[in-house]
Structure formats: C-alpha cells, structure tokens
Amino acid sequence: MVLVGLMHDMGKVLCLFGEPQWAVVGDTFPVGCPYSNKIVYPEFFKFNTDFSIPEYQTQYGIYEKGCGLRNVNMSWGHDEYVYQMLKDHLPEEGLYMLRYHSFYAWHRENEYEYLLDDHDREMLKWVRLFNPYDLYSKNPEPPNWNELRPYYEDLVAKYLPATLKF
C-alpha cells in the first residue's frame, strides 16, 4: 500500500503536458450506463452527449448485470492513466486502489452494485482501506527526504522496472 500511496496521483502529471485540470482530476465513474446522482455535480451530465444516447440510459447501459468492473469502461482521468502505466507491475489489490480510488460513487456511496461481481466485492475492502490516505492526509511538516529516499528507492526497485512507459 505504501507504493500505491507514492504513485496513486502520478497520473496528475498529465496537467504538465497540456491536459486541462477537468480532464485529469475529480471523481471517476463508469461510462456507457446511467450516471449515479451520487457523483459530484451530477446536474452537469445533461450536457454530456452520452446523456442523450438511449442505450446508455437503460437499466444496465451497455453492460450485463454482474459483469465485473474489469469489463467496465471508466471515465478518463489520473486514476486510469496511472493504472495503465502500472498494471503489469503491482499486485491486484494495489491496482484496484489505483484505478478506483476516485470512484466515490462505488466505494463510498455503494452505487453501481449491478456492475459488480464477487471479485469486485472482495477488492472493495482494499479501496476503502486506502481511501483515508488519499484525501486530506497531507502533513504540514514535510518529511525528511534524505532519510526516506533509500526506503522508497528499494520499494520502487522491488516492484517497478527501471523505466516506466508514460
């Protein structure tokens, strides 16, 4: 979980390369199915062209009930970017934490139950376990990087290749 904590917002580097903030940060959600009113600012979905596609507004949208989140397309953002970057290198529990830590409608509001399979329900505990370390967990005292650097270098070397593909 420590490596996930280090890497989870790495996808926000997209803002440094011209992506607008709205396309990188914020809650994530499934696409191709009805939007939950538990997603932050749900009133703006009416301006999304997907909102007018009838198939997306059916009970399950383009998905089958219980299809599993691994078969669901999520909105694009920093979570999906870092997940794609690290998906071949981390244990599955960490990958769930990375990919779904901003999917609050699921892990905090219990929405989208119809998409889940048993494996997603098992992995939910890991996403919830990680959540307190995501939001509002900043320490006003900066850590001593010289003391921490060897620990993090060893951790990164254990799981990640010398070069990551962004």
Regions found by a protein language model. Give the residues of each.
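Divalent metal-dependent catalytic cores for phosphoryl transfer on phosphate-bearing substrates
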Residues: 1-146
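C-terminal helix/juxtamembrane-tail motif
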Residues: 149-166
